[in-house]
């Protein structure tokens, strides 16, 4: 009986199957990379604000401590946005006629809140507690980056689940002494893993990666 298909058919079939698998894998890879990209996460994108508050000036230049403005960071889940009164503690005397700060003065006079543009916008299904992290040695700059060098704040990290899990699985790589939590210029020492392992034990850190830890 004569052969129905040409002998090259087997090769074409194998190439087609391999090509299909490769194309599917490449598509998945591209989708995942796009999902991690700043285009989706909006990382490193400075946001315009009603008042161009500069962390570079206030933190980097003047040395203002994070807790002066974010007063609840070590006490509650949210770090807190300072009321205008906090701004006016200084700006009632300094730059008190600056047109740039008129929205601050108007907010203070009228008792209305300034509508800041949110930068770190976690989805509603993700729970994050600031106090639980800073009180266990996770520094501000670990998540927020060098805000002392940011004229306008941007989101330094992706805030995606894989980024969170990296720290939850290996906290010894990131934990620091409590005295350095608010030091945004802190650099991990050469023996960070040894130090971190010791601090994880001292602080009683129990890494949790179960879904219910963050999705409540």
What are these language model-derived features?
Residues 76-80, 97-101, 150-154, 174-177:
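Short Cys/His-rich "knuckle" micro-motifs
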Residues 63-72, 84-93, 140-146, 163-170, ...:
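The canonical Cys-X-X-Cys-His
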Residues 1-52, 56-60, 64, 68, ...:
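N-terminal export/targeting leaders of redox proteins
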Residues 124, 129-178:
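Soluble extracytoplasmic domains of inner/organellar membrane proteins
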Residues 58, 92-93, 131:
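Beta-hairpin (beta-strand-turn-beta-strand) motif
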Residues 2-6, 94-126, 171-216:
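Primarily the internal scaffold of c-type cytochrome electron-transfer domains
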Residues 59, 88, 134:
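Nucleotide phosphate-binding site architecture
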């Amino acid at each position: 009986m004569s052969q129905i298909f040409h002998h090259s058919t087997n090769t074409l079939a194998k190439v087609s199957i391999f090509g299909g698998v490769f194309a599917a894998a490449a598509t998945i890879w591209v989708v995942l990379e796009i999902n991690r990209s700043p285009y989706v996460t909006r990382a490193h994108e400075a946001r315009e604000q009603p008042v161009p508050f500069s962390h570079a000036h206030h933190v980097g230049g003047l040395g203002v401590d994070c807790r002066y403005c974010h007063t609840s960071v070590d006490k509650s889940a949210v770090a807190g946005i300072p009321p205008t009164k906090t701004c006016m503690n200084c700006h009632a005397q300094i730059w008190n006629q600056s047109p740039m700060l008129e929205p601050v003065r108007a907010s203070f006079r009228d008792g209305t809140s300034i509508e800041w543009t949110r930068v770190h916008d976690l989805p509603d299904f993700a729970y994050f507690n600031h106090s639980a992290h800073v009180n266990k040695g996770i520094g501000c700059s670990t998540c927020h980056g060098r805000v002392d060098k940011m004229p306008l704040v941007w989101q330094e990290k992706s805030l995606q689940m894989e980024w969170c899990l990296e720290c939850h699985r290996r906290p010894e790589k990131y934990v620091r002494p409590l005295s350095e939590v608010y030091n945004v210029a802190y650099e991990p020492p050469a023996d960070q893993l040894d130090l971190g392992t010791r601090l994880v034990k001292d602080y009683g850190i129990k890494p949790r990666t179960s879904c219910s830890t963050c999705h409540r």
